[in-house]
Regions:
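Conserved NAD+-utilizing ADP-ribose enzyme module
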Residues: 1-91
């Protein structure tokens, strides 16, 4: 599994989007190529330089549950485009 983070700040949080209810949703990618592609789309939308890190599925999901954070796992079959910047954050 892979997360998108700010380059140089990998220990300070990963990319998340905010849903219509104000909940943060952590984006988790099954494939590294998909995470890299998403990071590139973010950078094209004037985000700072991004980095992709590998994480163990059970560790990141457990961290989400402990911190009461929602998450979404994207498969290679999913088409993912960044939402508007005001709907994003790093958690």
């Amino acid at each position: 599994m892979y997360l998108v983070t700010l380059d140089g700040k990998e220990n300070e949080g990963a990319y998340s989007a905010v849903d219509e209810f104000g909940n943060h949703i952590l984006y988790i990618f099954e494939e590294k190529d998909d995470a890299i592609r998403f990071a590139m789309l973010l950078e094209e939308d004037d985000y700072p330089k991004m980095n992709v890190i590998e994480v163990e599925e059970n560790v990141v999901i457990m961290a989400c549950k402990i911190n009461e954070c929602e998450y979404r796992i994207f498969t290679p079959n999913d088409i993912v485009v960044p939402p508007q910047q005001e709907d994003t954050n790093f958690i």
